[in-house]
Structures are given as C-alpha cells and as structure tokens.
C-alpha cells in the first residue's frame, strides 16, 4: 500500500511527514525551504516514497474563517494539484504548530535550536489527525478496510 504525505506550510519552511505503509502512523520526514524549488522537491518525495495522497494543513482562524495565511496555503495547494499525480486534500491545522512546540518542550528539546524539526512535528500532527479521522469514519461505517474510502 502506498503512503500519505502530510504538509505543514509556512512562509519560510514546509514541514513534511509521511505515513507508514499501513496508513496508521505518521512520522516526521523532512523540512523543506519554502522557496521556488519547494514544489519540485515535494514532487520528488511523492515519487521516491510512493505517495498516492497528500494532506496539506490549512491554518484557519480560531473562528473557522479563512485568513491571509490560509489563502496563501490554498494557493499553494492549487500549485501542488497542478503538478502532482495524486490527490491533494486540505485539513484544518489550527494550533498544530503550538502543539508541536509544546510537545518538543515537554520532551526536553530546545525549540529554538530545533526550529525546522518543529515544522516536521506539526506536519506529523496534521497527518496523524487525518489518519485517525479516516480510520474512525471507516470503523463507524463498518469497513474493515478503511483505506477503500
């Protein structure tokens, strides 16, 4: 089974996480500079890691509205959809970066020194939330093979 790629978009860096082959667990993958080569690197990852599905976190405002950061993220999603050979879906990522900072602090990590890793952990949280939701929906529908949805 192919993997799912999760992305935490930022103006400076893009955190990437990848699922295991069973699509149950998300793992930090890498941090990519948010520059002109970012889409090419993501296309490379999709090819190398046999990704057939990409989940992009959209930073909605706390009231659920789409702000400037979410608008930029949605524009990037459209660029990805134009170049990637697989579906690109969006996922609400409110407070994942805050949660990633907290998790790293609680693990005794200096988040300033591991700035790029915070983005990977945020991407991992986005992807894990997506994987958990898919599994929950499939289980509630009585599907043993939740990936068929």
Give the label of every model feature segment:
Residues 2-7, 11-12, 17-149:
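Phosphate- and other anionic-substrate recognition elements at nucleic-acid/protein interfaces
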């Amino acid at each position: 089974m192919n993997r799912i790629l999760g992305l935490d978009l930022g103006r400076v860096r893009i955190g990437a996480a990848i699922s295991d082959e069973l699509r149950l667990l998300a793992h930090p993958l890498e941090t990519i500079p948010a520059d002109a080569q970012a889409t090419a690197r993501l296309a490379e990852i999709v090819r190398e890691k046999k990704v057939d599905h990409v989940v992009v976190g959209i930073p909605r405002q706390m009231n659920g509205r789409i702000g400037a950061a979410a608008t930029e993220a949605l524009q990037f999603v459209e660029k990805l959809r134009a170049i990637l050979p697989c579906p690109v879906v969006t996922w609400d990522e409110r407070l994942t970066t805050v949660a990633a900072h907290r998790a790293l602090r609680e693990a005794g990590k200096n988040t300033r020194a591991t700035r790029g890793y915070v983005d990977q952990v945020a991407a991992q949280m986005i992807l894990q939330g997506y994987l958990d939701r898919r599994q929950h929906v499939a289980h509630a529908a009585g599907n043993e093979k939740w990936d068929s949805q």
